[in-house]
């Protein structure tokens, strides 16, 4: 569970505000925002769909495939 920082008097400090990755609307990061970092379930599902359709990806090393001249065929 994420806890917001508290001051010496045990009162919450300024809430953390993040931008929704989908629509860029400001969202308070806390228990009252169940879809954080997204502002709504809709924005959360839009993001999930983009990952599922491979519109988003995590950069990494390129795949070596047959088109790159690599093959499982050893030529025996």
UniProtKB/Swiss-Prot annotation:
Source domain of life: Bacteria
Bias (Acidic residues): 65-76
Binding site for Zn(2+): 20, 23, 39, 43
One of the record's GO molecular function terms: DNA topoisomerase type II (double strand cut, ATP-hydrolyzing) inhibitor activity
A Pfam family hit: YacG
Cofactor, how bound (note): Binds 1 zinc ion.
Cofactor: Zn(2+)
Entry annotated with the keyword Metal-binding: yes
Alphabetically ordered keywords of this record: Metal-binding, Zinc
Gene Ontology biological-process annotations: regulation of DNA-templated transcription
Stretches for region Disordered: 54-76
InterPro entries: DNA_gyrase_inhibitor_YacG, Znf_NHR/GATA
Protein's job: Inhibits all the catalytic activities of DNA gyrase by preventing its interaction with DNA. Acts by binding directly to the C-terminal domain of GyrB, which probably disrupts DNA binding by the gyrase.
Family per similarity comment: Belongs to the DNA gyrase inhibitor YacG family.
Quaternary structure and partners: Interacts with GyrB.
Designated name of the protein: DNA gyrase inhibitor YacG
Gene encoding the protein: yacG
């Amino acid at each position: 569970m994420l806890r917001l920082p508290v001051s010496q008097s045990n009162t919450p400090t300024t809430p953390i505000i993040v931008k929704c990755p989908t629509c860029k609307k400001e969202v308070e990061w806390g228990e009252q925002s169940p879809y954080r970092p997204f502002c709504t379930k809709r924005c959360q599902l839009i993001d999930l769909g983009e990952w599922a359709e491979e519109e988003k990806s995590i950069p990494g090393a390129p795949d070596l495939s047959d088109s790159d001249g690599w093959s499982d065929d050893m030529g025996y």
